[in-house]
């Protein structure tokens, strides 16, 4: 009887030890050991995009600075935005870092960093368009990036039931091309992108004053990767303190927009 009890206790102890091993968060150590951090991004200027074959943008520059502090290489992998969570969970990327809005629904699938950027959802339309408010979207064809905050904001708005059609695009740049070609009447998107588009072609576009809502951007990690998330937050705080983040923000926006 005593021998049987000893065996049962031994099995229980081994099981508990295995559970402890399973619960150890090696997310940060794994990155350091392999010497590389894989960042998922999409075509979303000015946060992250390709220009002349090179990956660039505000988020890209901040990520590179984080990599230097951490002592690892940063690999940028282009992803379909509507498959971002699948890419993360499959281990194809270590994080989503490209104007990712923090929402309660996304928190169920994604572990977020501290907010690092504030943004609003606005309407982008052609300079000579009669659209000057959200209500003017009624009976219009409105473009959005698939699975974006712009899509969510439009669907949740009072005007949604009266628009002619919501046209979904894989990337926001595709929506802009269609807007310019006359395929749609307006786009609902992040203000930071809309202002970037206007800055590039001030004579082509305008942004009505009325906004849908305000939001914060965060970096998205796997739910269990707390150690990695905490370290990235710590490094970004340091970049804000030593002036590196300010320099990057001034480069892209002409002012300090980092929420740290």
Task: Label each PLM-derived region with a short phrase.
Residues 17, 21-22, 60-69, 135-136, ...:
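Extended ligand-binding regions for polar small-molecule ligands
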Residues 12-15:
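C-terminal motif of bacterial Sec signal peptides marking the signal peptidase cleavage site
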Residues 117-125, 173, 191, 195-237, ...:
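Periplasmic-binding protein-like
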Residues 64, 68, 73-136, 206:
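Acidic, polar ligand-binding/catalytic clefts
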Residues 83, 100-108, 152-157, 178-181, ...:
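A ligand-binding cleft/hinge motif common to bilobed small-molecule-binding domains
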Residues 49-50, 63-72, 150-169, 198-202:
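Ligand-binding cleft/hinge of the Venus flytrap
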Residues 25, 75-86, 129, 166-178, ...:
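Short helix-initiation/N-cap motifs at beta->coil->alpha
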Residues 20-99:
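Extracytoplasmic small-molecule ligand-binding "clamshell" domains
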